[in-house]
Amino acid sequence: MLVIQSFRWDDKNYLELNSDIRKELRKNRVNADIRTFYLDCECYMAEEEEERMYNFIDTIRLWKPDLILVNDDQATYTLMKCGHPFVKKVPVVFSGVNFPNWDLLEKYPNVTGSWDKIDYKENLRLIDQQMGKSRIYINYDKTSLGQLAFRELIKAVDTSRYVLNYNQLAFQLNDPDFKVDSMTFRTEMRMKAIRPSKNVIHFMPFRKANGEFLLSNINGTYPYCVFFNIRYDYTSAGLSKMFVTPSFTAVREIFNINVEVLGGYFCSNRIQAAEQARLAAKILSGTPVSSVPIVESPKEYLYDWGEMQRLGISKEEVPTNVHIINMPISELGFLSPLPWA
């Protein structure tokens, strides 16, 4: 069995994900010789990336894996886009894909998987429930996946309860799509020290920001601010690590990798691996891929205990539907001393 991962081999997320994939395959009684290829997508332009994938697929034709497991948007898209004829000859199960390319998928009847549709609305509700009315900072970028994430987020926002603030895009990027007058901008700066009456979503061009702008917005100068990660790329972990204020995430990749992310509502590594292994086992047992429809991945609410400690959040302050990981045994609360201890 071939596993294709989108990012570098040393991506912190893969230590857990690769282990979970093996565990879940064993649970489904799939005893597989697993080989893993890391696309390292952040280091290549689109054409180079497709060529890299094509050349790699060329090397496995003689090995002929029974099935390919491919993870996340970049590797899934590039596997189909590279155009290697072998890709159409072997069953493929994708997982962790936030923005499926449906047009491309129609050309590959041998490809199925689980769609990790990001639930922005539920994550915003969680932030409001945990933090109260806040200024929610979101990294804005004009990459293809960045624009998809931006559009999906906008669709999910209830504008009767949230204010969408594009001011920094107008001033920092001189972006003609976003206009604001300087008086509005100055008023906003004066109001930053006051808790807003509505949640305010600030779209921040952190990729293009100068040092002064970046530092003034991440160092905790202004209260009632949180960082919300809406998708994953090479900037996500670094930004979350730099923010002094609480960080939430709508995707699994930067959770539980020691970059100071409190948590969120998303499809965890455990769920992703379980879904992928379940679909793989079904296909390997003889079910045609055409009879295995693409499904939407389940999600769960997760917080990291260590980050709760850093932020001074007690167990009693956490919503009851949130599962806390990395909690020491002494804090679990259900263990009582043995009668003979």
Task: Please tell me what each predicted stretch does.
Residues 2-341:
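Short hydrophobic alpha-helices and adjacent helix-cap/hinge residues
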